[in-house]
Amino acid sequence: MGGKEASRGFLYQGFASVLEALTDKNKWDKIYIEFPTSNDKVDIALGAANKVIKSIQVKSTINTFSKSDIMVWLRDLIADIDAPEYELCLIGQCEKSAITFKNSIEKFYNNTLDNTAVKSLDGFSTDLLRNKRINFVILPFEIEVLEKIVRDSLHKYISYSNQMLSFDQISFIASATVNDQMISSTHGDGIDRKKFDEELEKRIFLIADKYSPKRISIAVTSFPRGAVHLEDKTMCLSLVDKFDGRNLKSGY
């Protein structure tokens, strides 16, 4: 893998890990990037009570994912680590046969196998599917679209804290969070859910408190020409002072 492709894959892992952290919050208490295993097949791992509860591999391609590749990746991922749940995060487009294979696995779990599914699963041991769950997440290859998906997930997260942030503010927090996840992969220790939430909430409240516009209500009262002692009836606000140094449109 070349330098450009490696950097892009590293970035995609950051996006995928943030999405996992934001959308799968009810299960994990620790998230790992580049989780160490004997065959290095686990890109992201979710942990709970010192056990891996979800093992994730992230793949990306500018071309298309084939069924044969997906079968190999699943076998290797399952063989590399024992977990109750596995996930292939595919960033890019899938061939028709790959989509059929993905749907066939879902039919296997739902006990709704038909002739198409049986044919698609031929050559792949369904014993690998028993007593565990295999999921697929398919995301677009375009970084701009991934950024939007992360922003939307973060927006939903922020809404639970009753904060109102602008598009630019959410984008800033999203980028910083992805960057944090990428840096954490170099440490190998993982990130506690408590710390993840605390750091994210700290950013949210800091941005909301320091950089959110504040609305101030101003009441305007009119008086007839020649009225005196206005100060007894209201408090006068000098707009000249407020707009000092600013250019106003002619006629105002």
Outline where the language-model segments fall.
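Acidic metal-coordinating catalytic centers involved in nucleic-acid phosphodiester chemistry
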Residues: 1-6, 60-252
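Catalytic centers of nucleases
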Residues: 6-7, 11-75
